[in-house]
Design a protein with these regions (language model features):
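Internal anion-binding site segments
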Residues: 94-141
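Donor/substrate-binding cores of folate-linked one-carbon enzymes
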Residues: 1-111
Length: 141
């Protein structure tokens, strides 16, 4: 069985995982992960990861909507291939990343994104002001 997790596992697992990449100034880590269901939250072997194209002017909610849209489109393609009998190799998660709980999120976190950064974190990232790491994604389409 597969789960669609709205976050990039293993880096952002658990709750509000389209928010936390913005809080940590990593909007390029906003994405979705298709993975096997396991007892540990969002820790199953990965089939595919989707990330949206980031564009100037995108805010946190734009990126969240784009993530759902691209994950849906890519899942359709994956499902069509599964129906035709294609088998995919799954990639075991090599690290635990961070498991975020609902209790971790406070309204002050969101105020920081809006008040301190004026919801322009994507703009800062695209301008090269934030630097940072780049996720190595598992992709099958």
């Amino acid at each position: 069985m597969l789960n669609l997790h709205l976050g990039l596992s293993p880096w952002y697992r658990g709750a509000a995982t389209l928010f936390w990449p913005f809080y940590f100034l990593e909007p390029n880590y906003a994405g979705a992960t298709f993975h096997q269901i396991t007892a540990a939250p969002d820790a199953g072997a990965i089939l595919h990861q989707s990330t949206p194209v980031l564009e100037i002017g995108d805010g946190i909610h734009d990126v969240a909507a784009k993530t759902v849209e691209i994950a849906t489109l890519e899942f359709r393609s994956i499902l069509e291939q599964i129906i035709t009998g294609k088998e995919f190799d799954l990639e075991q998660q090599k690290s635990n990343g961070k498991l975020f709980l609902s209790a971790d999120f406070k309204p002050a976190h969101l105020r920081l994104v809006y008040d301190e950064f004026d919801n322009r974190i994507v703009d800062e990232y695209l301008a090269g002001s934030l630097g940072g790491r780049i996720p190595k994604l598992k992709r099958v389409v």
